[in-house]
């Protein structure tokens, strides 16, 4: 399936990654230990590692519902978001993350609402799932503020460090989305 290449919110642009994004995505997001704490990836140690990751990201985004997140004012890449269709009409997040200095100002909510609008209205989804580490209270609050409801928790083991943690899963149906 061919997905849209760009979406916009009040303060942000969600668009496909480009090699020119290397320094901003590295400095604002990929090198951060704080940001990576609740994510499945490890921080990049240098620009060479980030360059390799950016090439993989560009290739992944060509065929998937995935974007870098850009600040409209500075044009810098500050995070990323991805969703996959796990069953016909059912989507699940593969991550929504922002650099630590961009958290707490409503950007996550803008991104999630924008993605939900696209998934429900353009892709005709019936249901969308999102998840977060149980200890990531700001992420859980953001998901609920966008209309998602707690569904269930599961134990997950991260590949990067074999840490086993509890993941809380949230869901929103097409019907719930349309009533917002």
Please tell me what each predicted stretch does.
Residues 29, 39, 58-61:
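Hydrophobic residues in alpha-helical segments
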Residues 55-68:
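A short helix-loop-beta-strand connector motif used in the catalytic cores of GNAT acetyltransferases and
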């Amino acid at each position: 399936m061919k997905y849209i290449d760009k979406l916009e919110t009040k303060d942000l642009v969600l668009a496909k990654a480009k090699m020119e994004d290397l320094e901003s995505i590295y400095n604002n997001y990929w090198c951060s230990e704080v940001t990576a704490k609740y994510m499945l990836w490890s921080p990049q140690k240098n620009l060479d590692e980030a360059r390799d990751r950016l090439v993989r990201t560009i290739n992944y985004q060509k065929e998937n519902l995935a974007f870098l997140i850009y600040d409209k004012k500075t044009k810098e890449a500050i995070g990323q978001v991805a969703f996959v269709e796990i069953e016909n009409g059912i989507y699940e997040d593969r991550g929504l993350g922002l650099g630590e200095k961009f958290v707490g100002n409503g950007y996550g909510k803008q991104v999630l609402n924008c993605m939900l609008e696209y998934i429900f209205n353009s892709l005709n989804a019936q249901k969308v799932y999102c998840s977060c580490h149980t200890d990531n209270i700001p992420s859980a609050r953001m998901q609920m503020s966008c209309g998602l409801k707690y569904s269930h928790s599961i134990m997950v083991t991260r590949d990067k460090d074999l840490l086993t943690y509890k993941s809380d899963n949230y869901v929103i149906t097409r019907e719930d989305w349309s009533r917002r």
